[in-house]
Amino acid sequence: MAKASNAELKRFTRECVYEAFFRLLQTEEYEKITVSAIAAKAGVSRNAVYRNFESKDMILKSYVREFAERVAAELKSERIDSDARYVTFLFTRLCEFREPAKILAGLHMETLLLEAFLSIRDHFAVKTAYRDYYENCRIGAFFFIYLTWLENGCRESPGELCALVRQIVKKTF
């Protein structure tokens, strides 16, 4: 059997830490969770956690950033050619992210979610004044619709959310 590379071990450690931290967040208050508790739940040493993350805040920030990077990479490879497909794709990925997002919203860390939205936008925004306004309007709408969707129990499908966004845009503008 081939030996795992350092990069693979690092990725595995990070994934274990993410999973452990989110499991702890389901049952314990954020402030009461220690790096030692995260390490124990992940089955790694405290040093392994600190080699990968400066703090427990950075665990959350890194998790959200990595999610946004994966979505941006998928969007690039999909070559999405219409706003409707873009919105449906984005809400499909965000639907998969709902459990971590609910935890972050419950911790009043919505700004981390907004940073993810902005990061995804930055990969695709055409650098013109008009496009910047357009993208910011669109991302703001996605962000607050996503938060509302989380608060309402995630009842609608990504396709239904896309239709809702299109309806709102038509009525608003």
PLM regions with names:
Residues K32, S55-L60:
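Short amphipathic alpha-helical segment with a characteristic S/N-K-E followed by hydrophobic residues
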Residues M1-K10:
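N-terminal intrinsically disordered/low-complexity leader segments
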Residues C16, T34, A48-Y50:
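Residues in the helix-turn-helix
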Residues F12-R23, T27, K41, M58-E78, ...:
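Alpha-helical structural segments
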Residues E31-A37:
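Ser/Thr-centered, proline-biased regulatory motifs
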Residues G43-F53:
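Short hydrophobic/aromatic patch on the recognition helix
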